Amino acid sequence: LNKNVKSAIDQAYYRIYKFHSLQKFKNISYTDKYKNKLEYKYIPLASVALYVPGSTASYPSSVLHNAIPAIVAGVKRIIMINPGYKGNQNPAVLYAAKKCGISEIYSIGGPSAISAVTYGTKKIKPVDKIVGPGNAYVSAAQRYVSGDIGIPSLTAGPSEVLIVADKNSNPEWVASDLIGQAEHDNLAQCILISKDRGLLDKVKIEIQKQLKTISRASVARK
């Protein structure tokens, strides 16, 4: 794995961990003046499954953003399900999983993966909750099993972004934000709104410039 990619994952890990560590709940226990003992006890889930998209793109960020909150919360068993691509796991995704201490990894994806971690198989024990984004089929499967397992309140759909910018906005950054969502899939919806014609023209030029540097330009252009 490229050392720059490793370094980026390491930096992202510590930044995300720092943020979520500030969110950690604390147990509460006190006795009021009537001698009543009142408590609030924080009990983390026993197990969660991270669904990490695969196919033609890789998302080590999905590993970090879903695993780290579970780590901070104290979840004991964190597993990863990832379909990979043509039978291979992406090195960056595997490195992110290693960074998060995840050793239980299954190369499966789609609705069958959701079913496996919900109800269990001969080799996979069921979990308490599924987190992480997927395509339309994965989202449909999550909604279908929602009565039997914990799932996010809003399942993921096609990527969308709406940016409102003005003359003070950086065209390079705006273009990067648009492309960052557009490259996810063919159904992504990316919109830029601005009253400044000059900015719009600069962003268009910047988009074409940046598309030449990414491997998923054909997807982003759609």
What are these regions (language model features)?
Residues G101-Q189:
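Conserved NAD(P)+-binding/catalytic subdomain of aldehyde/semialdehyde dehydrogenases
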Residues L187-K222:
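NAD(P)-dependent aldehyde/semialdehyde dehydrogenase
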Residues N2-I16, K41, T56, V63, ...:
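Generic structural signal for well-ordered, non-membrane alpha-helical segments
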Residues L1-A46:
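N-terminal Rossmann-like NAD(P)+-binding subdomain of aldehyde/semialdehyde dehydrogenases
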